């Protein structure tokens, strides 16, 4: 591989919605930083069978529902 053209690949901490933390190698952030997830397999309806509540960050879900209200979504 050529030197100096690839991003730094280092260890970061990932914090799940339930508070658990695990380490993973990534190009995100800097060595030792923590990435806090808003949606993960524990809180996403696709993996929970619809039992988890979807968080409306930025009003995107509300905007979608209002835009397509007449279609029965």
UniProtKB/Swiss-Prot annotation:
One of its GO terms (molecular function) is structural constituent of ribosome. One of its GO terms (biological process) is translation. It comes from the Bacteria. It holds the Pfam family Ribosomal_L31. One of its GO terms (cellular component) is ribonucleoprotein complex. Keywords: Ribonucleoprotein, Ribosomal protein, RNA-binding, rRNA-binding. Binds the 23S rRNA. Belongs to the bacterial ribosomal protein bL31 family. Type A subfamily. HAMAP family: Ribosomal_bL31_1. Part of the 50S ribosomal subunit. This is Large ribosomal subunit protein bL31. It comes from Cereibacter sphaeroides (strain ATCC 17023 / DSM 158 / JCM 6121 / CCUG 31486 / LMG 2827 / NBRC 12203 / NCIMB 8253 / ATH 2.4.1.).
């Amino acid at each position: 591989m050529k030197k100096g053209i690839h991003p730094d690949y280092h260890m970061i901490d990932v914090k799940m919605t339930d508070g658990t933390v695990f380490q993973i190698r990534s190009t995100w952030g800097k060595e030792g930083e923590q990435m806090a997830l808003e949606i993960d397999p524990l809180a996403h309806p696709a993996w929970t069978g619809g039992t988890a509540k979807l968080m409306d960050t930025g009003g995107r879900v509300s905007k979608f529902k209002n835009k397509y209200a007449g279609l029965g979504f």
